[in-house]
Amino acid sequence: MLLLQQPPLVSTRFHSLYFLTHHHHHHHRFFQPPISAFSATTSASLPSPSPSSSSSYFSSWNGLDTNEEEDNEFSSEVHRRYDFSPLLKFLSRFGPVELALDSESESEASPESLNPVEFDLVESYRAVPAPYWHSLIKSLTSSTSSLGLAYAVVSWLQKHNLCFSYELLYSILIHALGRSEKLYEAFLLSQKQTLTPLTYNALIGACARNNDIEKALNLIAKMRQDGYQSDFVNYSLVIQSLTRSNKIDSVMLLRLYKEIERDKLELDVQLVNDIIMGFAKSGDPSKALQLLGMAQATGLSAKTATLVSIISALADSGRTLEAEALFEELRQSGIKPRTRAYNALLKGYVKTGPLKDAESMVSEMEKRGVSPDEHTYSLLIDAYVNAGRWESARIVLKEMEAGDVQPNSFVFSRLLAGFRDRGEWQKTFQVLKEMKSIGVKPDRQFYNVVIDTFGKFNCLDHAMTTFDRMLSEGIEPDRVTWNTLIDCHCKHGRHIVAEEMFEAMERRGCLPCATTYNIMINSYGDQERWDDMKRLLGKMKSQGILPNVVTHTTLVDVYGKSGRFNDAIECLEEMKSVGLKPSSTMYNALINAYAQRGLSEQAVNAFRVMTSDGLKPSLLALNSLINAFGEDRRDAEAFAVLQYMKENGVKPDVVTYTTLMKALIRVDKFQKVPVVYEEMIMSGCKPDRKARSMLRSALRYMKQTLRAS
């Protein structure tokens, strides 16, 4: 029997890098990752068939890809030795070959007899080495129109036992189907062969490219269960997909990173950059900086886009000095920062710095020949709106026009968002007037901001009028629109209208996302409609949407507020069992729920679990704990929490002192209330109405006591 030589392994796309993190104190071996379908195939490619006729494909066999010298050599070899056009003509003799994976294939079993034409074909191709079949299939799959023909070739090869590396052929097909957004067909095809590392990797890549992260992660887990190691390229694709679809969060990324470490995968440059950017995009610049330092220590220069993403994350976190330092590092490396890099730093100045810093940044851009874009101007408008300088914001609009940057709906949406965040929702009408005067037509994003503005300030009639106007202009609402409307109706107690909006959303073909379900779960919980809430959770899971941290936090909150503490604890345990880490917000909700019912012991236990999970106690959690002791008439323990706060660098706020005064009043220790009030003032807290009311109540009772004596 002729043994066909397997194609050589292709090297990774980038230079390799392996991190030794502080978790490991010994060296690891370098592991070569399993090959993936698209990197394992020989790089030669054949011309794709024209959609109009199959004959054009047969006549264009000579037109091989000439991008690489070795491609030319290999394709010339193919041309000299083998002509596949008779086979392709035979398979397409009844017309264009359609991709029919869900039907029973006629060629699965080896035939007992053949017609003379097919017999001659089989004999003529019996000696073709496997790499040439790989090249043929890769060529056919380069065009969607010839995917059916590619599958027909693979089926024909199996039928006649002409190739002994079908897993690679199937991997090429699966990869091509994923690239053509035919994920369903890719899964059907994968079922026709036992999954191997090659086909696993191809299928995971197809899922990631189609943003079906849940399936990709499930396949990686199943692959590991079967004793195979995932390809590092797949992790890159998964992280890129999460980043691209804005679904990435630090907890999920950390879990993926630990998997990579545990599997001792060799990290390539692309994966390192993807991980760093992923942490930055997920709002965890500290982890991104840590990994950047590790990468630079190995001599790796991060991509400009990676550095800009960290600068942006630092700016979002208000860490402007660190963002400045990284921006300067970018400049000193010889790279001329472009508009996007300046915008990332400008965002930090708008968020935390004085207005002059934002203005000087824009001036510096212009001096260095970097043209401001609409995002630059919108950030500067944000800065002026934050400073209450509406006229200056209008001047920026005029500057945009003078600089040939036409103000668009996005700029006006930022202007409106600034007024919304400052509580000046009445200026909405002024913005609309200004927008109309220069001929800018509102788009979906602008309408979403308008609806959100009206919803936040309980102007629900205005919100619905805006929604109707949006529809009348032919602008289809997106998930943000529906979520905003549903949420604002829920928050103002209009649960029936919210439910109607949820149903209308589905009727119009807009599929609810995790955020939508979380809003409705909270609505049902507030109404104590537990059966409806569980039904909705089931529906959410049936649609492939996994409950996230917000879902579990919402469940803990609504269960806790209703005294269903066993259900709340069950949610916490379920969350941990699926690898999600409970957040401080979740424990705050549980502690507060116990506090409202005076269950101080349970509140303390929840607090202990919180700290044992590695979460730093927040001011909110500690205030809730003080409230729990106060409700349980345990004022000594309440003041012990205050002492704990002082010793651990948590600054008490007005809520802390007000809650302590309430605890003293509850146990009739009125004479101590003025002392707490005075300490509050001395600590720099400004008393609010509730604090002053507590003091008056205590003084009034003390006065009555003196009179009675």
From Swiss-Prot:
GO molecular function: mRNA binding; single-stranded RNA binding
UniProt note: phenotype after gene disruption: Seedling lethality under normal growth conditions.
This protein's UniProt keywords: Chloroplast, mRNA processing, Plastid, Repeat, RNA-binding, Thylakoid, Transit peptide, Translation regulation
Pfam family, one: PPR_2
GO biological process: chloroplast mRNA processing; chloroplast organization; regulation of translation
GO CC annotation: chloroplast; chloroplast nucleoid; chloroplast stroma; chloroplast thylakoid; thylakoid membrane
Transit peptide interval: 1-54
PPR repeat residues: 196-230, 231-267, 268-302, 303-337, 338-372, 373-407, 408-442, 443-477, 478-512, 513-547, 548-582, 583-617, 618-652, 653-687
Places the protein is found: Plastid, Chloroplast stroma; Plastid, Chloroplast thylakoid; Plastid, Chloroplast
Coiled-coil zones: none
Main location: plastid
Cleaved signal peptide residues: none
Taxonomic superkingdom: Eukaryota
Summary of subunit composition and partner proteins: Interacts with PDE338.
Family, per entry: Belongs to the PPR family. P subfamily.
UniProt function note: Required for chloroplast protein synthesis and accumulation of subunits of the thylakoid protein complexes. Activates psaC and petA translation by binding their 5'-UTRs. Required for the correct processing of petB and petD mRNAs. Interacts with the petB and petD intergenic region and is required for the generation of petB and petD monocistronic RNAs.
Alphabetized NCBIfam families for the sequence: PPR (TIGR00756)
Protein name: Pentatricopeptide repeat-containing protein At5g42310, chloroplastic
Record organism: Arabidopsis thaliana
Gene designation per UniProt: CRP1
